């Protein structure tokens, strides 16, 4: 279950999942932009190339009318992916646990000095984070178990 | 392995190798060139072949590596390739005259819906990312195991599974949206339309219903329908089938059009 920690100047939502699949599969799903809407029910479109320094355009179910322009800030294959904008970053991490499975975690922290001014306008992320992690787990394990 | 035994076994594999290369290059000349280069390279390196894999796997590995350097293999087509090429063919009198000449004079100029289904898959599969296209052909048409494909494409089992799953899913969705043989709402009827042109005495619907994939369509099992489509490809050798000359002529036409189309639309 996703959890959110709120402070005056920030909000941080995180979720994690144990996925019985090779890290390469999880990484491939996380880094192939155009494929997101197929397996991820929280993303309606994702354009661009997910690679270090690139800018991507994301549309999510949280705000269907808005396009988020995000920069890929860290890109460590099969380990860590970070994208974000001036308001915050989303950090994906994949940790191999040694038996062919991985621990996936996703954290997004938004905030800053102006955060109290717009905090109430930002919808909660918890449900979509749960959905994201669940979709990723399901798709990764389906691929891993395919013959 | 002796050269004599190699030559003997090569003869048994070359047909499949050539058809694989045709399906990924969409070019008769390039497929033939890569087959020749594969033979030369394999012969040169025969002393290094330790028989850790089958000769077929080894040859497909060499051929795939050579193919990856081929520009026509690298070029990715568009999902609606058959719409674009149909529009061009309809305004190209010469294309139909040539096709009709092949139809009436060549022993390999028959038109069969099944052969067009295989041809259509070859064209549309070129819209997939290359790795996905290669994995689908290797697994579904040339019946390699996942472990053998890891050798052929020099990648991991996990990635082969990823490419297969994503490629299959994409192709299932494309055909579900387009192919009138499996979806009454499908926008593409080209195989039946061409059957009407080349086999005017046949009733297209009766011909369609001879195909198991069309018979099974109403059950709506998309994965099964895709498997049946792959079974059609496995049955057909695009160089030796009864319709090969007609289909190769059509493929050359489409490839030339796509070469021009991609050149015009590239930034």
Walk through the language-model features, giving the residues of each.
Chain B
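Intrinsic, short, N-terminal disordered tails of RNA polymerase sigma-factor systems
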Residues: 4, 8, 79-130, 147-154, ...
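Short amphipathic helical patch at the helix-1/turn junction of helix-turn-helix
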Residues: 22, 139-141
């Amino acid at each position: 279950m996703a959890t959110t920690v709120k402070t005056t100047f920030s909000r941080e939502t995180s979720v994690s999942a144990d996925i019985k699949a090779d890290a390469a599969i999880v990484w491939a799903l996380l880094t192939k932009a155009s494929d997101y809407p197929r397996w991820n029910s929280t993303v309606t479109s994702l354009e661009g190339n997910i690679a270090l320094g690139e800018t991507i355009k994301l549309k999510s179910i949280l705000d269907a009318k808005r396009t988020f322009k995000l920069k890929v800030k860290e890109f460590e294959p099969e380990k860590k992916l970070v994208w974000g904008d001036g308001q915050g970053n989303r950090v994906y991490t994949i940790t191999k646990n040694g038996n062919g499975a991985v621990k996936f975690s996703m954290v997004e922290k938004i905030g800053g000095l102006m955060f109290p001014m717009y905090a109430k306008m930002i919808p909660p992320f918890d449900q979509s984070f749960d959905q994201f992690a669940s979709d990723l787990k399901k798709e990764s394990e389906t691929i891993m178990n395919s013959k | 392995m002796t050269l004599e035994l190699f030559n003997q076994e090569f003869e048994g594999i070359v047909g499949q190798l050539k058809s694989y290369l045709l399906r990924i290059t969409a070019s008769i000349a390039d497929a033939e060139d890569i087959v020749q280069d594969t033979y030369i390279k394999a012969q040169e390196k025969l002393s290094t072949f330790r028989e850790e894999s089958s000769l077929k796997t080894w040859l497909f590995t060499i051929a795939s590596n050579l193919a990856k350097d081929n520009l026509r293999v690298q070029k990715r087509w568009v999902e609606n390739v058959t719409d674009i090429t149909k529009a061009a063919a309809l305004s190209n009198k010469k294309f139909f005259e040539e096709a009709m000449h092949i139809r009436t004079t060549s022993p390999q100029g028959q038109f069969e819906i099944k052969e067009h289904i295989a041809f259509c898959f070859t064209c549309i599969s070129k819209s997939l990312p290359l790795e996905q296209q290669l994995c689908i052909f290797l697994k579904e048409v040339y019946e390699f195991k996942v472990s053998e494909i890891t050798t052929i494409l020099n990648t991991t089992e996990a990635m082969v599974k990823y490419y297969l799953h994503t490629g299959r899913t994409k192709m299932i969705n494309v055909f579900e949206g387009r192919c009138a043989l499996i979806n009454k709402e499908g926008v593409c009827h080209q195989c039946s339309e061409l059957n009407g042109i080349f086999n005017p005495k046949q009733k297209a619907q009766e011909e369609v219903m001879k195909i198991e994939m069309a018979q099974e369509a109403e059950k709506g099992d998309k994965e099964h329908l895709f498997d049946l489509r792959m079974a059609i490809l496995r049955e057909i050798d695009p160089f030796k089938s009864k319709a090969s000359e007609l289909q190769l002529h059509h493929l050359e036409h489409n490839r030339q059009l796509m070469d021009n189309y991609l050149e015009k639309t590239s930034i």
